[in-house]
Amino acid sequence: MKERIVNLETLDFETSQEVSLRPNLWEDFIGQEKIKSNLQISICAAKKRQESLDHMLFFGPPGLGKTSISHIIAKEMETNIKITAAPMIEKSGDLAAILTNLQAKDILFIDEIHRLSPAIEEVLYPAMEDFRLDIIIGSGPAAQTIKIDLPPFTLIGATTRAGMLSNPLRDRFGMSFRMQFYSPSELSLIIKKAAAKLNQDIKEESADEIAKRSRGTPRIALRLLKRVRDFALVKNSSLMDLSITLHALNELGVNELGFDEADLAYLSLLANAQGRPVGLNTIAASMREDEGTIEDVIEPFLLANGYLERTAKGRIATPKTHALLKIPTLNPQTLF
């Protein structure tokens, strides 16, 4: 399947641009108000006690600001943040090298934390609970455990698949936050702020139109903003007006609901099953897509907006999907 403009993964060329558009202060971070409020209280209390923050877990679909909010936490705590990802921590020595280089109150951010191996988790437990690193030297009867004290630090874990976390690891987080999709008004404000940073003039209705098609996700909103900006430049227009915006979004294949070809193919597959549950492996095979991508990228927004139901037997299209695709149900009074 061709690359999606509404793909939720960060593309390589976007990394530096994302950093430049990233909010640096609470007042710059739009949305997630309940999470922000709770974090501000926790940060204030930790600073008054002169302690590190409790370990915390952020979970939810990609692109909702887990990394950005972690950077703000570090700035508010006036400390350093070390960013890594679980797939990069292959051996206990990798984790030990990271932990022993942390300073007091530093923040360690581990993305995709659900992908840590059980062996790495075992090393992490005493580090989280007792700020102690247990290293085993040798093997068999001659093996010895060396205990190394660590400075108090805060572990921030981020995951798109909280259900895959082991219970012992999940229980060691003092705070757990579910990141929510953003409203169109929040996304419109994010888009206008980003456009200002890019020195790009944009009409209010253009920002609103991009926001409507951004699947409740800032990462997608910023990506669409930059692509529409390219169209405006090619059209020799210094202003992103509604006409250019609509033309660009239609050319990019993103409809009024934020759906693209992959979303519509997914929904058509379910709707044509006429109420019969469709298994994830069947969907993945039909779409030639990875099961994890379907679960983490395609389904969350569709599920949150009522276009499908997940059951023990598989996925089922809702009446909302049948109405959208104009695919009638064979027996609507008994299907749902």
From Swiss-Prot:
Binding residues for DNA, per the UniProt record? 310, 315
As recorded in UniProt, its EC number(s) are: 3.6.4.-
* Positions that bind Mg(2+): 67
List, alphabetically, the GO terms of the cellular component aspect: cytoplasm; Holliday junction resolvase complex
Matching entries from CDD domains are given as: AAA
- Keyword Repressor in record: no
Q: Which residue ranges does the record annotate as region Large ATPase domain (RuvB-L)?
A: 1-182
According to the record, the residues making up region (Head domain (RuvB-H)) are: 256-336
The entry marks the following residues as binding ATP, namely: 21-22, 63, 66-68, 129-131, 172, 182, 219
**Small ATPAse domain (RuvB-S) as annotated region, ranges:** 183-253
GO terms classed as biological process? DNA recombination; DNA repair
Keyword Hydrolase included in the entry's annotation: yes
GO MF annotations, alphabetized: ATP binding; ATP hydrolysis activity; four-way junction DNA binding; four-way junction helicase activity
Provide the catalytic activity annotation: ATP + H2O = ADP + phosphate + H(+)
- Entries under InterPro entries matching the protein: AAA+_ATPase, AAA_lid_4, DNA_helicase_Holl-junc_RuvB, P-loop_NTPase, RuvB-like_N, RuvB_C, WH-like_DNA-bd_sf, WH_DNA-bd_sf
Keywords on record: ATP-binding, Cytoplasm, DNA damage, DNA recombination, DNA repair, DNA-binding, Hydrolase, Nucleotide-binding
Entry function: The RuvA-RuvB-RuvC complex processes Holliday junction (HJ) DNA during genetic recombination and DNA repair, while the RuvA-RuvB complex plays an important role in the rescue of blocked DNA replication forks via replication fork reversal (RFR). RuvA specifically binds to HJ cruciform DNA, conferring on it an open structure. The RuvB hexamer acts as an ATP-dependent pump, pulling dsDNA into and through the RuvAB complex. RuvB forms 2 homohexamers on either side of HJ DNA bound by 1 or 2 RuvA tetramers; 4 subunits per hexamer contact DNA at a time.
How is the quaternary structure described?
Homohexamer. Forms an RuvA(8)-RuvB(12)-Holliday junction (HJ) complex. HJ DNA is sandwiched between 2 RuvA tetramers; dsDNA enters through RuvA and exits via RuvB. An RuvB hexamer assembles on each DNA strand where it exits the tetramer. Each RuvB hexamer is contacted by two RuvA subunits (via domain III) on 2 adjacent RuvB subunits; this complex drives branch migration. In the full resolvosome a probable DNA-RuvA(4)-RuvB(12)-RuvC(2) complex forms which resolves the HJ.
Family affiliation: Belongs to the RuvB family.
Note the NCBIfam families from the entry: PRK00080.1, ruvB
- Protein name, per record: Holliday junction branch migration complex subunit RuvB
Instruction: Please tell me the species this chain comes from.
Output: Helicobacter pylori (strain J99 / ATCC 700824) (Campylobacter pylori J99)
Tell me the organism's taxonomic lineage.
Answer: Bacteria, Pseudomonadati, Campylobacterota, Epsilonproteobacteria, Campylobacterales
Q: Which gene encodes it?
A: ruvB
